[in-house]
Amino acid sequence: MTNNRVRVAVTGAAGQIGYALVFRIASGQMFGPNTEVELNLLELEPALPSLEGVAMELDDCAFPLLKRIVCTADLNKAMDGVNWALLVGSVPRKQGMERSDLLQINGGIFTKQGQAINDYASDDVRVFVVGNPCNTNCLIAMNHAKDVPSDRFYAMTTLDELRARTQLAKKAGVDITAVTQMTIWGNHSATQYPDFYNAKINGTSAAQVINDETWLKETFVSTVQQRGAAVIKARGSSSAASAANAIITGVNHLVTDTPAGESFSMCRRSKGEYGVDEGLIFSFPCRREHGELKVVENLEFNDFGRERFNTTLNELRSERDTVKSLGLLD
């Protein structure tokens, strides 16, 4: 028996991540078996025939929880009345493109998306940004949705966290469930800091269990930071199914209270925690308690951790300053 309904916008819905994602939302994996789902699927005009094919497949699955599908290239229509906006689509970086070019192109997209969310979404809307560079895209969207509380904007480092947990579990020879409190700090980029010092394996320090600091500092950190590029090299295209899985997991973290002794990584607006500039979208260790998202406090860094933390923080400052100079922030 269902007792509530959620309307979800998915941008880039006919893309590889979108295709891997929407069926799992419709089946109840994101919001649970008691929540009916309406899907507002957004694509560019040329991709609408492909999107209609996705909608046909959704129909053919006969998901009991899926009550409505809207396929559109109209951004305002896509955001109409949505409770969740999953901003998956973005322009990928192409050869010869500077990072500032990427920020400018996507900045225009996420400016419009923020405005549409502000003007058309439900009063309780929450926004989960996946399209890269996701931290700064989230910052731009948030900046252009002034009527939406800033604590309802998130960007995804869930995939990075899951990658890191897997690497630690494999190295330690333990089940994936044994690895907890695996924090990704900072930017969803190659500067991110996967904090193995504060991670736990069966409740004990991961560094102590693995007892190979050289592997942790060099192989582990670089493997997590470069995993996306490694997948592209092996598969010929970027992570799609694993990214979709991480979106499911990430949103689930945000709608379900966190078990005792656990935490998860999430990019959210800084309120000055750990010395991060207020207003930056930064990945922190988080917990959801009684429906409220809180940053885990009082974690400590050694010199190695502090250096990595500062590197990713400085990159996010640089991205913010770049988009500000481009007129994409107030």
Curated annotation (Swiss-Prot):
Q: Which family does it belong to?
A: Belongs to the LDH/MDH superfamily. MDH type 2 family.
| Enzyme Commission code(s) on record | 1.1.1.37
Decide whether keyword Hydrolase is in the record: no
Q: What is the lineage of its organism?
A: Bacteria, Pseudomonadati, Pseudomonadota, Gammaproteobacteria, Legionellales
Q: Which UniProt keywords apply?
A: NAD, Oxidoreductase, Tricarboxylic acid cycle
What this protein is called in its record is Malate dehydrogenase
Question: Is Oxidoreductase tagged as a keyword?
Answer: yes
Q: Can you tell me which residues form the catalytic site? A: 188 (proton acceptor)
Q: Which NCBIfam families match?
A: MalateDH-SF1, PRK05442.1
